[in-house]
């Protein structure tokens, strides 16, 4: 197995993520009224390219090393592939934490599977963080089995467009490959998003258009 260099950051990672096929979908999405963000991201598409996934893992491994992490823990489900890549890049044991409220086997299966996390410093890995509700719940699940979450590593940090951020997610050291607004900027710069649509989208997000704002009609809806 070829050793992975985790010593130097890859400055092109944000662009590679933003331009991953299918990650940014042209058009707007208003899943529940005026909820932002307006551009849905299919972040699992960043995992399709093995070279990109390996480099994402290297960035996470650098962060894990800085924090003195004992175990890398992937958040079910979208954080698991990225956490595995971080584990492989850094040579750090891997585990994953079940999604709180998982139905079907909650009485038969432990909340954390894989490496033992009791008494360990762990890095929580997920695809994104926005309001931080998921981070709080996963952190509580890990604390319940004796683990200490010392940091969070995500593909995309979306806290800048969240209406509010949970105190737990705000306080934990967090590193991301890119941010939501940077993804949109890079997607527009590389021809994935129409520049006019992009400008309207950013305005909608930053200025929080109301539900009855007529400019919504100017934004094509995502399929």
For the regions a language model picked out, list residue spans one by one.
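Portal/gating segments that form or line small-molecule/metal binding sites
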Residues: 80
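Active-site-facing substrate-recognition patch
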Residues: 1-68
